[in-house]
Amino acid sequence: MRLRTPRQVLLILSLLAAAVPVVNAQEALRPRDQPFPGIIELQVDATNVGQKIFKVHERIPVKAGRMTLLYPKWRLGAHSPAGFALSQFAGLVLTGNQQRLEWKRDPLDVYAFNVDVPAGVTHVDADFEFLSPVERNQGAIVATPEMLAIHWEALLLYPAGFYAHRVIFRPSLALPPDWKFAGALESTGEAGAEVRFKPVNLEELIDSPIYAGRYFKRIDLDPGAKVPVFLDMVADNPGNLEGTPQQIQAHRALVQQAYKLFGSHHYDHYDFLMALSDEFTFAGIEHQQSGENGVRTTYFSDWDRQQAWRSNLVSHEYIHSWDGKFRRPADQLTANFNMPLQDSLLWVYEGATSYWGHVVGARAGLVEVSQMRDGLAATAALYDHRIGRSWRSLQDTTNEPIITQRRPLGWVSWQRAEDYYSEGELIWLDADTKIRELSGDKRSLDDFARGFFGVQDGRHEPLGYTFRDVVDALNAVQPFEWASFLRARLDGHGPGAPLDGIARSGWKLVYTEQPSNFFKDEEAYRKVTDFSYSLGFGVDSDGRLVNVVWDSPAFKAGLTGGYTLLAVNGRAFKAELLKAAITAANSGSEPIELLLRKDDRYVTERIDYHDGLKYPHLVRIEGTPDRLAEIFQPLK
C-alpha cells in the first residue's frame, strides 16, 4: 500500500469538498413528479416580423433561495439536442420586486441559469428575445412579412426540479394587426392584437405550435365530426391557398383512411398547419394534436409533380399522432426537455411512420399508386447501394440525429445517415408481406397497426413501448420468430438492402435507361440530375457534383463532392450531353472524359464506364400475388 503525504491527503479532501456543492446542485436539478406551485405567465410579442425578433416576458412564482431556470434542450421530433440553437436566445434579464437579479449559467449545463432569490420576492420576471434566423445559413426561417411559426420551446424558461407535465403555463401571444392563427391551444379571447390561451402544462404547450399569417385559410376536413380536423394554411400570397375540390377531398380521405387503419384518435381536435411559402423554410415536424407542414407555394398549382412530398410530409406527420406521439418509445419518455433522449426505436417511430405515411397517402388518393411503386423502387435502389452497411448497422443509425444533428455529410453512402426512416420502411414492408404470406393473406400489418397504435381511443398521455412489446404485438397478429426477424435486419450487414418484402409482394427491382416520372419529379424538386447508379454522383443546377457514391466509378476516379463539371468529352457540360455520353460509351470502348474545377484547380478525369444509364423501377414477378396492390387498396 502506497502511503500519501499530508499535503496529498489535504489536496484530496479539498477536492472532495469542492465536489459536494456541484453534486448537490445537480441533485437540485433532477426533476420530481410533483406539482410546481403556481402558474407561469408567458407573454410573447411576435409583431416584429421584419427583423424576425420575438420578445418574451415571463412571470414565474418563486420562493427565497437558489432557483434554476432551464432553456429547453431536447426536442422530441428532432431526436437530438438540435431544435433551436441556444445561440439565438439573447437579452436575458431577471428581476424581483423591480430589482435586478443577477443570474449565472451553470458550469456543467449551458442550458441552465442559476439565480439567488432574495427573501420577500414571490415572483421573478424574466425578459429576453428569441432572435430567429434572418438568413438560411443560420437555421430555418420561421418568420416572414406574411407568416410566422410559434415554437414555444424557443420562447420560454422553466423551473428545474419538476416533471414537465406538472408545470403549468398561461400563454399569450401578440401578433401583427389583422393576422389570423391556428394551433392546438385553446383560446380564451383576444384583446387587440393579443391572443390569450387557456392554462396548459409545459409538455402540451411545447407540443402545440401556432401558425399565423396575413393570408390565412381554414378548411374543415371532417365536417360534422365530434372531433374536428382542420387544414389551416398560411401563404405568401392569397392565391396560393386555393385548392381544387379533388385536392381537398384527398386530404379529407387521408383522415378517414387513418381512422379506418387505427380505429382511434388521440386528440381533441387536429390541425394540419401548413405554410405555403418560398421564404418560410421550416419543413415540418410532428405533434399529437397538430402537424407542421412547410411546402412550396405551388403545392396546389403543381399538384401532380409534388406527390412524393405530400406522402413524405403531410401524411407522415399525421401518422405520427399515433406512432411517435401517442405510442412512444419508452426510452423517449423523459421527465422534461433537458433530460437526454435515447433513440433506439426510431426504426419504429420513424420507419413505421414512413411506411404508413406512404400507404395511407396512396389509399387516400393523396398520391397515385404508380407513384408509390416508383418511389419504393427509388428507396430500394438507394439503400441497396448504401455500401456503408458493411461496417454500420441500421440499428446504429438511430444514433445519427445526436451525432450529426443533420449537418451535411461528405460521404453519406459510406457514413450512412438517418437510414432508419426509409430502410426502416423496407423492413415494415417485409413484415407486412410476411404476415400476409404466413396467414394466407387473411391478416396483415393493418392488424398490427390497430392492435398496437390504435389502443385506448381518446387517450392523450403517451403510452411507452419496448422492443419486446413490438415483438409481442406482431406475434399476437401472426405467430413467428419476429425477434430474430427484426434483429437480423436491424443488426445485419447485408449484402444489400432488405428487399424480401418487395419480392414477397410480387415485384422485383430492375434498372432501365429511362427514369420514372417519380424519379424525374424528384430530380426537378431537388434541382439535381442523378447519375447515382451509373457514374455514381448527382449534378446540381450549377454543375456541382453532389453525393459521390463510395466505390462508384466516380469515386474510383478520385472525385468528391464540390467539383464543378465544366465539360464532357471536350464539350461544355449539359446534363443531356452527359446522358448521351454515358449511352454512347455503352457500345464503345473509349472512357468518358470529364473536365472539372475544384477551387482554383482544373482536372481532367477519364472514367472507364460502359454500362449505360441506370434508373430504378419495379416490375412484376409473373405468377405471384400482387400484394402491393392489396396494400395500397383503400380500406372500406
Which ranges hold each PLM region?
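Bacterial N-terminal signal peptides
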Residues: 9-20
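Juxtacatalytic substrate-recognition/specificity segment
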Residues: 58, 220-346, 352
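C-terminal recognition in membrane/secretory proteostasis and scaffolding
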Residues: 357, 367-636
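Early extracytoplasmic/domain-onset interaction patches
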Residues: 26-75
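Post-HExxH zinc-binding segment in Zn-dependent metallohydrolases
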Residues: 291-300, 326-327, 338-389, 595
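Bacterial N-terminal signal peptides that target proteins for export
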Residues: 1-11
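Non-catalytic architectural context of zinc metalloproteases
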Residues: 34, 47, 59-61, 81-267, ...
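Intrinsic-disorder/low-complexity, polar/charged segments enriched in Ser/Thr/Lys/Arg/Asp/Glu/Gln
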Residues: 39-41, 53-57, 66-68, 112, ...
